[in-house]
Amino acid sequence: MSEASTQKGHPKGLYLLFTTEMWERFSYYGMRALFTLYLTKALLFDKALASAIYGDYTGLVYLTPLIGGFVADRYWGNRKSIIVGGVLMAIGQLLMFTSGMFYTTPSSATAIMLLGLLALIVGNGFFKPNISTMVGQLYPQGDKRIDAAFTIFYMGINLGAFIAPLACGAVGDTGDPADFKWGFLAACIGMILSLIIFISMKNKYIVTPDGSPIGGVPEKVVPTIEEKAASDKVGNGRAYMWLGVLVTLYVIFKGVVGFDIIGSFIFACTVAAPGYIITDPSLDKIERSRIWVIYIIAFFVIAFWAAFEQAGASLTFFAEEQTDRNLFGWFDIPASAFQSVNPILIVALAPLFAMLWVRLGKKNQEPASPMKQSIGLFMVAVGYVIIALVVKDLGPGVKVSMVWLFSLYAIHTMGELCLSPIGLSMVVKLAPVRYSSLLMGVWFLSTALANKVAGDLSGYYPEDVHKKSAYGAPKFEANFNGLDSTVVIDANTKFFASNAKPSMWTVATTADNKKEAPEKTGMDKFMHNMTADPLVDYFTAAEETDVVTSVAIQTSVTPKIEEHKLKQITPKGEKTKFSIGVSEDANTAYVLKMTPDEINKEKMNVAFEVWDLNPKKPSIFGQEIKNLYEFFVVFIILAGVASVLLFFLSKTLLKMMHGLR
């Protein structure tokens, strides 16, 4: 038995890649579990904007493997790409930690966060396709152990994904926005561990069955002068043609269809990159046929991941706001912890599914890859059927049992086991060796598009309240009853937290978004009589710091804010001091928040927010999404239709695989 083999017949290199990927996925899923919560609870973005950023980030995370795969196949090799990618991702997580330190100054925190996301996106592009490709390279071509190897590798991914939300959520998702940074730091440590393990052991274990190193700089074949001239003419012409297609499609998607910049680029790449590969004249008939199978199934996989990846966006909002997370009256489970349900079930169920496929294979009844993936899509649709029925007649402010969310994740997990590891194995089996990493990148490209779509669809999540605008207030003045003079309260004092309720406020603000700021001439429209409830005081905001408006508090009785809406405006666990005013028509709330500065504890950061208490419901294809039931039906239709279509195409795709399954 060679140094690189185990008694169970798998190379030891598989378990090194298992551990490396486990810690990298710990880093990714730990940050992802906190990301939308960080955006909405710390940086105070609304759900639509947070969902859009989430979709852009996860979409680009799966787009850049296309570039990373190309660089590895042509220039760097797998090993160098993995190391470079890991270093960039560690830097990205460190920047996320830094962003969390400055969350009380949203402009600085957002800028640092965007740099962190950029590093994570580029780093993932080099890391992800290359480590998956190396798993297949550990085995001889046609080895029957490859499917089992990818199942084991997939368990490593999900073991990291299980631990991450629990560990990062325990220190980051505490209800206090100041703690998000510790979750990001934990994710950074996970990435550093992944790098240390891979770099220290790669030379010993990442080898072929005959002991040759895997993943080095690719050998350059030196062609004859005639071959080089012919190749350059065809290759360069083809590259320029598809680059032109990429640019043209981008312009169409951006200028005509109206997609955003990132969405337009992802959609354009989804057409141009596969087109570049399939038009390679060196491909023979069988190779081209098998590549078409990858493309067709990848198209249907978009529907799967667009529905499945709601876990990090709309289903996180659902866990936070609509799920009773109290466990036996002892404590509330963090919303981020629910993202551990899927990976732990993967770890538990993956061996059972592997045994099922083996048993069916012995009876000559094992479904081919396209059929398995059709089943996976069907299971996702079933999961949404269950949760949709549960929320159909849900009253305002009523929360559902966490059992139903667990049920959805359990069914989705079974669907994932029918689709995702089978897809990775299928790409390795069907891809020509010279295009192995690049086609793995194309496979992830479908996931990129799916994640972008997932973020956009999450933006249709119906909200009870919607934050219209937010402003930073460097200081405000309060005129108290019984005082002859105006007391000026600067943002570096704790006066507000310890003194009596003001009867008159003058608030000087700076607008983060000038387009959303109230017009100077329209200040009167905010001057409504307010309820005398002790919680509610009235105040207003000016567009610029030199515009000051004073409004006396009135005591006439007007509608109060419903409790379930109030909880969304003033989240439990925040150290912020709140004063809230509601307009006479009960459609708008004005919130003044004072939060201790994270760096200088003696300083108070002041923010002013305007909330729509009865926001307009979103609509998709002209159909208004009035409630959660209608929102979840969207995913039932998306996954269900894709499942049926792929089912009927399965036999045709099997023939196109030319003997492979």
Q: Which residue stretches match the model-derived regions?
A:
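Central cavity-lining transmembrane alpha-helices of secondary-active solute carriers
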Residues: 55-71, 340-353
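Low-complexity, proline/glycine-enriched hydrophobic segments characteristic of transmembrane helices
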Residues: 332, 460-627
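Short amphipathic helix-loop junctions that connect adjacent transmembrane helices
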Residues: 33-49, 313-335
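A membrane-interface helix-boundary motif in multi-pass transporters
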Residues: 172-189, 255-261, 368-371, 460-482, ...
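C-terminal ends and interior cores of transmembrane alpha-helices
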Residues: 87-107, 378-396
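Glycine-rich segments within core transmembrane alpha-helices of 12-TM secondary carriers
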Residues: 61, 148-165, 190, 443-454
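Conserved MFS/SLC helix-loop-helix module at the cytosolic interface between two early adjacent transmembrane helices
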Residues: 67-87
